[in-house]
Amino acid sequence: HKNRLNKSCRVLFSKSFYNRSILKKLVSESYDKAAGVSPARLGHSHTRLCIPVYDAHKGAMHVFKTSHHPELIREYQMPAVDVAMSTAAAPVYFDSYGFEYCPINGGQKMTYSNIIDGGIMANNPTLIGYTEAVQSLKIPVGDLAILSLGTGTNLLSDLPKTLTAKYWLYENKRFRLYDLISSAQADYTSNLMKFYQRGIGNSGTPMFIYDRLQHSFSDDDEVGMDDSSLRSLKHLENIGQELYGDYATSLL
């Protein structure tokens, strides 16, 4: 109850639930150590990346990418910590994020402001990866093998008769409006990928490999997005082991 009161007070005084300063420091140190330079850039990644964010200032979606295509000559130079903080800026939980950087080749300084979590439109980013592979990298659809890891979904079984503003914004310690937006997008993308894979009715011959691992929480075992208690972390670990057990045969 104390934690819930603290969050409510922060919102009343126009503050997000959390301050990102310590998180940013830890992430920055980790990235710089791995890259061997400071600041570590997105291009220091050892694998291809497509990281979605939403630019509230311009009302536009961005996907920050590594330089895995000859035309991708800009975003790979972004400081990795700024990309991470941008896509982690979930509304209410963290303030929107802004940053600027200078390209390595000495080009014009780039500035971004009011960037928020890409999860509001790509909580399930599978379609981004699919499109990048097929359209940008020209990988044949039949060669695709996609593993999509969900963040969990919750059936709203405790619905009141009328869904009021209080229910959506802060009922039982949960910010349900954000849950709804991210879950709806994730479910839509998953259904769309199944359609691409097997066609109408999910009954056709698979065009490519697609596995979606998603856990359905009940009201008594749900873990909040900002719940980092040891009990909840252990519960999430157990869920991961159960999902692997259920899908191990198809994944291997």
Locations of the language-model features?
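Conserved catalytic cores and adjacent C-terminal regulatory segments
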Residues: 1-252
